[in-house]
């Protein structure tokens, strides 16, 4: 029987099991199964996935993120805010502005601290990737993929594709509560045009500074929030002429609000909370 200490944290209800790999050890060959086991709501702790906080050669810390199906993602906005909180509060970093390595690249985090605790985290998510090769999608072309039609159940849905280190398909609807989240979501997620699968967001524009947001996450299904998805949604809204670049947008997710801005300089900034749920020790056994 093996075990490790964990901290369960969430960003707007998007929860992960966080493991401090500066102190713990999980064999590389076990990570996929451990992520599946620990995320299981019935036989594990229950979460949207597992995130490892690891040493890095190029930043103070490195984030590795696994979905609850065991697949490894390149980035996670809500996860980054929680990693930033954990790193500062556990003295893995000393400054309130620092970098985090991800499989999608290095991002900059800035934490707001009150009485030694991080209350907000702002992440510079970098520039969005908009070409088919960058997202990635099948096909050729260097122009952004904006409002392309997808036929489902005899209805045409126009989606815009954006990568924020992971792929997103953003669909604008009149009412997110009526959107085909659990039906169209998995169909589009696994469509052959997306070789690495895709996260699917449904967006309802409320005004020039607010939107409602629902998400079907690649590898996890319906979740309460998706930070990279909120960033992709704001980028897509600006590309479609629905919102203004350089302005801070409030994204209302099922789990709460994020503040997102696509700056004139090109990077996307995300600001929101990160909270600890519980801590403990998880025991597991990998069958031979």
Swiss-Prot record:
Q: Where in the cell is it found?
A: Cytoplasm
**Active-site residues, as the UniProt record annotates them:** 76, 226
Tell me where on the tree of life, at the top rank, the source sits: Bacteria
Q: Which UniProt keywords apply?
A: Amino-acid biosynthesis, Cytoplasm, Isomerase, Lysine biosynthesis
Identify the EC number(s). Answer: 5.1.1.7
A biological process (GO) of this protein is: lysine biosynthetic process via diaminopimelate
The pathway that the record names for this protein is: Amino-acid biosynthesis; L-lysine biosynthesis via DAP pathway; DL-2,6-diaminopimelate from LL-2,6-diaminopimelate: step 1/1
A cellular component term (GO) from this record?
Answer: cytosol
Site note Could be important to modulate the pK values of the two catalytic cysteine residues, residues = 168, 217
Per the record's keyword annotation, is Cytoplasm included, yes or no? yes
| Membrane spanning residue stretches | none
**What InterPro entries is this protein classified in?**
DAP_epimerase_AS (IPR018510), DAP_epimerase_DapF (IPR001653)
Catalyses: (2S,6S)-2,6-diaminopimelate = meso-2,6-diaminopimelate
Q: Does the keyword Cytoplasm apply?
A: yes
Offer an example of a GO molecular function term for this protein. Answer: diaminopimelate epimerase activity
Q: Which leading EC class covers this enzyme?
A: isomerase
Positions binding substrate in this chain are 14, 67, 77-78, 166, 199, 217-218, 227-228
Q: What does this protein do?
A: Catalyzes the stereoinversion of LL-2,6-diaminopimelate (L,L-DAP) to meso-diaminopimelate (meso-DAP), a precursor of L-lysine and an essential component of the bacterial peptidoglycan.
Q: Which HAMAP family match?
A: DAP_epimerase (MF_00197)
Could you give the subunit structure recorded for this chain? Homodimer.
Q: Which family does it belong to?
A: Belongs to the diaminopimelate epimerase family.
- State the name under which the record lists this protein: Diaminopimelate epimerase
Report the source organism. Bacillus cereus (strain G9842)
